[in-house]
Structures are given as structure tokens and as C-alpha cells.
Amino acid sequence: MTPVLVDSNVLLDVATADPVWSAWSSAALERTADESILMINPLVYAEVSVGFPTIEALDEALPASLYRREDLPYEAAFLAGKCFVRYRRGGGSKASPLPDFYIGAHAAVAGYRLLTRDAARYRTYFPKLLIIAP
């Protein structure tokens, strides 16, 4: 089973019962969990944490038995930095690398697929990355 790194937007859709995306995100998570190992990293964890009052509540929503936690590889951090340079040279205005660069780079260097509902940036900066998206 090829692991799948889950983007925070999918998890937040489910956690917040997003009226537009929660049905798609819930179904995609369920389908992907049946056929793959679901992965999260510290950036995904941090982004999702804003919707929870305590770490215990977050850990209950993202149980380690369902979401394997993995640190960000240094190779992914390097690649994220290179993507950020490309972004800035292309006119991007952010002053530091975006979380999506770290998430996409992690999936890319680890050989994982990525489950997201916001595929455009990932496809731009990680064209070989296998993406599960609407």
C-alpha cells in the first residue's frame, strides 16, 4: 500500500463540517483509508490544530491508529525552499515558504500520494506528484 499524505484542508473540511466540501472530503478519506496508509506531518498537524481547543481534542480527531505521524524529511525542507524561490521569482508575495510547499515536498520526496482538494499549487510545483483531488 502506497502511503497517502493527507492535506490539512481535507481534515478541516471534515472537522468543521464544511457545507461545500465535507461530503467529498469524508468520502475521500474513507476510500483512501481502505486502500492506503494515511499520513500526516507536523505542518498538517499545526494547520488542523487551529480548529481544536486542546491537544487532546486534536489527538482524538487524528488518532495515531488511523493517521501515521511522520516528521518532515530534511530533503523535503530543501525542496520546499527551492519551490519557494521559484514562487517568489514568479511574483509570489509571501515572505516565507508556504505550508503547502512543505506538504507537497514531503509527499514528493517520500514517494507518497497526496490527498487534497486544492491541487492547483501542488500540480504547479510538484508536477510528478500523484494527487487525489476532486
Give the predicted meaning of each segment:
Residues 1-40, 50-60, 125, 132:
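Short, well-structured N-terminal submotif of metal-dependent ribonuclease cores
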Residues 3, 30, 104-134:
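Acidic, PIN/NYN-like endoribonuclease modules and their adjacent C-terminal/linker elements
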Residues 4, 37-39, 66-71, 113:
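Short loop->beta-strand "edge-of-pocket" segments that line small-molecule binding or catalytic clefts
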Residues 6-7, 41, 96-97, 118-119:
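Histidine- and aromatic-rich ligand-binding microenvironments
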Residues 15-18, 47, 90-94:
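Short, flexible loop segments at the rims of nucleotide/cofactor-binding pockets, characterized by
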Residues 53-75:
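Active-site-proximal, substrate-binding regions of enzyme catalytic domains
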Residues 68-113, 117:
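Active-site neighborhoods of divalent-metal-dependent phosphate/nucleic-acid chemistry enzymes
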